[in-house]
Each structure stands twice: as C-alpha cells, then as structure tokens.
Amino acid sequence: MSARDPEARPGSAGACPSGGGLGAISGPPAGWHRFTPAQTIVRTVSQLAVAVLTAWMIARLGIRWDYVADAPQQVADLVHRMFPPEWEFVGALVRPLIQTINIATLGTAVAIVLSIPVAVLAARNTSPNAVTYTIGRVIMVMSRSVDTLIWALMFIIVVGPGSLAGVLAVSMRSIGFVSKLFAEGIEEIDHGEVEAVAATGASRWQIILYAIAPQVRPVFAGVSIYRWDINIRESTVLGIVGAGGIGFVLNEAILGLEWSRVGLILVVILAVVVASEAVSAVFRKRLT
C-alpha cells in the first residue's frame, strides 16, 4: 500500500512515512477550530477581569498575612498537643455521643414527617393550585437558607439550651432539603398509574396514597437515609452553641485548652461520621 493510496488509514505504515510507530498528526481533530481574534480578546479580558476581581475580594477580606505565614507552625504545634489523645476520657464521651446520634435521628424523623405535606404542595402535579405551590416552595427556601447553627441559636432562645433545641434545629434545616427531593420524586412519577386510579373515581388523597406513594417510596427512603447521614455530621457541632451532644464536650475541652482531650473527641467524631456514612451507603445500595 503506497502513501498515496486513498484507503490508507491514519497511523498505518503507509500513512506515516516518517516512522515512529504512533502515526503522524496532520492537524487538529474534526470539530476543533481556532478562536477568532475577537474571541481571543474577549477571553483574555474576561480572565483578567476575574483575576482582578478575585484579588480585590481577597484584599477586602482583611487577611493577616503574617498569621497565614505562621499557620503551618501553629498547625504543627496544635497537632503535637492533641496527640496522643487522652484515651482515658473515652468513657465520658459515650453519653454525649449517644445524645448526638439521637438528635440527628429524631431531627431527621421530624423533618421527614413535615416534609411530606410540603413536598405534596411543592410538586406541580400534586399541588392544588398556584398559591399552595408557592407556599410549598417558600417553605423549602426558608428552611434551606438558614444554617443549622443559626436555627439552633434561635431555638435555644425559645426552648433553652439542650438536646431539644438541637432536634428542632436539625429538623427545620432538613425540611427544605428533604421536601425538595421528595417533590422532585413526585414530579417524575409515571402518570399512567395516576390516571388509572383516578378513573375509578378516587379522591385526590386516595390518588396520592394508592398511585403516587408506591412509586416514590424508594426515593423517600433513599433521601431520608442520606439526610440522616448528613445530620449525624451536623449534630456533632451543635453543642458548640449549647444545643447538646458531643459538640458541647468539644467546646468545653477547647475552652479549657485540654488539647489531648480535643484530639480524642475529634477521633471519636471522625469514627462516628465514617460509620454513619458506611451504614447510609449500605442501606441506599439495598434500596436501589
């Protein structure tokens, strides 16, 4: 086969007279094109604008660069103080650790119960009208726009410090997340089953119960387990603001400069988070 053979393929011996074994690249792949001068100017100006804006924002943060330069040494010193952990303190962490898990579990359960009606209102195919749809969406946005720690601070004012404030904070934060995914699951159902149940003369709530609920049950279960996993992590820090759990013990250890105890608490928190992630992954895998 000669180099002029029209059937020669790129990378073959006839198409690569210069040798090398990898084939000569005669040009850019199909679909590639060069930027025009105007496009190049626009891209360059855009990149410079982003760089300038980033530099301006960093300058406005008021960062103490002398602290930043000293940060590696401070981190090394802090780690040196925290390790080895104070293993003798493990027994004192059992109760606050269980309290943390309870806060996450109860908060998730409350959120699931409250998220179901919100999701029904916020789903286009189940919301009675535009007003209820808007109400459902507003509830979702309000819940997700406020961080869990801020919810905790608000509920501490209402019900006082302790686990109840933590449960309420976790549930209020979770409603927006859970109801949003619930609503998306409801909107993606097979409408053929809904029409079949509706043809029997079923009411709106009977349609939701017998045609919609069976289809979205796996989604509900998966989202609930995933949110519980997230809440385990969030509940570990609620005690810092007085909402109970292992975070309260962590805050006391930090204020008391008991760094070996802080190291132990961080190790325990890491173990709990990893365990909850593993449990969540197992249950989600079984549901899919």
Label each PLM-derived region with a short phrase.
Residues 140-174:
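Generic hydrophobic transmembrane alpha-helix motif, especially the helices
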Residues 3, 16, 222, 263-288:
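C-terminal transmembrane helix and the adjacent membrane-cytosol boundary/short C-terminal tail
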